[in-house]
Amino acid sequence: MFDKLKEIIADKLSVNEDEITMESTFIDDLGADSLDIVELIMALEEELEMEIPDEDAEGFKTVGDVVEYITEHTEK
């Protein structure tokens, strides 16, 4: 899951996959703004064929937060 997520993040935020770790924060480490994050969530929803409610997405600060959320919500 992490590798797939890294591909999507690198594409949407125009960063190198090598810069992306589980601890990377979207705003401080990866240079995303709020619009970037919205677009990233939309891309994840499309790629993973799932819906991520806005209130859940607001809690995503790090790449690890997203991996944990997706893992929890796709295993059900």
From Swiss-Prot:
Keyword NADP: no
Functional pathway: Lipid metabolism; fatty acid biosynthesis
Keywords: Cytoplasm, Fatty acid biosynthesis, Fatty acid metabolism, Lipid biosynthesis, Lipid metabolism, Phosphopantetheine, Phosphoprotein
Pfam families the UniProt entry points to: PP-binding
Domain Carrier, residue spans: 1-74
Modifications after synthesis and translation: 4'-phosphopantetheine is transferred from CoA to a specific serine of apo-ACP by AcpS. This modification is essential for activity because fatty acids are bound in thioester linkage to the sulfhydryl of the prosthetic group.
O-(pantetheine 4'-phosphoryl)serine: modified positions: S34
PROSITE patterns reported for this sequence: CARRIER (PS50075), PHOSPHOPANTETHEINE (PS00012)
GO molecular function: acyl binding; acyl carrier activity
Keyword Lipid biosynthesis in annotation: yes
GO cellular component: cytosol; membrane
Cysteines paired by S-S bonds: none
Any GO BP annotation: lipid A biosynthetic process
Compartments reported by the entry: Cytoplasm
Database matches in PANTHER family: ACYL CARRIER PROTEIN, CARRIER DOMAIN-CONTAINING PROTEIN
HAMAP family the record matches: Acyl_carrier
Known role: Carrier of the growing fatty acid chain in fatty acid biosynthesis.
NCBIfam families noted in UniProt: acyl_carrier, PRK00982.1-2, PRK00982.1-4, PRK00982.1-5
UniProt protein name: Acyl carrier protein
